[in-house]
Amino acid sequence: MRTLWILAVLLVGVEGSLVQFETMIMKLAKRSGFFWYSFYGCYCGWGGHGLPQDPTDRCCFVHDCCYGKVTNCNPKTATYSYTEENDGIVCGGDDPCKKQVCECDRVAAMCFRDNKDTYDGDKYWKLPPQKCQEDPEPC
């Protein structure tokens, strides 16, 4: 019960595109981004250091790089417009910054979908920080 309460408190603080990103991951990869990717590898979750450990972790690395290139809005809180069409996501709206955030999230969600078979939770879930000490590659 305590775990559910803590999870509820954490989710209350999440807003904007992070909730939308979770929805995209659910739509495209058919799994929860929060539960599957929040503590995976060196780049999935908050922050990111070292080298991506596998193709799934690379999805998170590329997503972090994409967010780093966003200007004129906060990518973690900006709410954007998108539609679900067939089996995909189409980003819309007139705000270039919000559209860029949407594209970052869309590409990452597709990457998770396309790399589901590389996910190795036994090896990379809650990876110790000392495993992520290499010099990072440039975005």
Swiss-Prot record:
Protein's UniProt name: Acidic phospholipase A2 S1E6-c
EC numbers, comma separated: 3.1.1.4
Cofactor binding note: Binds 1 Ca(2+) ion per subunit.
Signal peptide (UniProt feature, chain positions): 1-16
InterPro entries assigned to the protein according to its UniProt record, in alphabetical order: PLipase_A2, PLipase_A2_Asp_AS, PLipase_A2_dom, PLipase_A2_dom_sf, PLipase_A2_His_AS
Catalytic activities: a 1,2-diacyl-sn-glycero-3-phosphocholine + H2O = a 1-acyl-sn-glycero-3-phosphocholine + a fatty acid + H(+)
Organism (species): Calloselasma rhodostoma
UniProt KW Lipid metabolism keyword: yes
Cellular compartments annotated: Secreted
Subunit-structure text: Homodimer.
A GO term from the CC aspect: extracellular region
Gene3D superfamilies per record: Phospholipase A2 domain
Sequence similarity: Belongs to the phospholipase A2 family. Group II subfamily. D49 sub-subfamily.
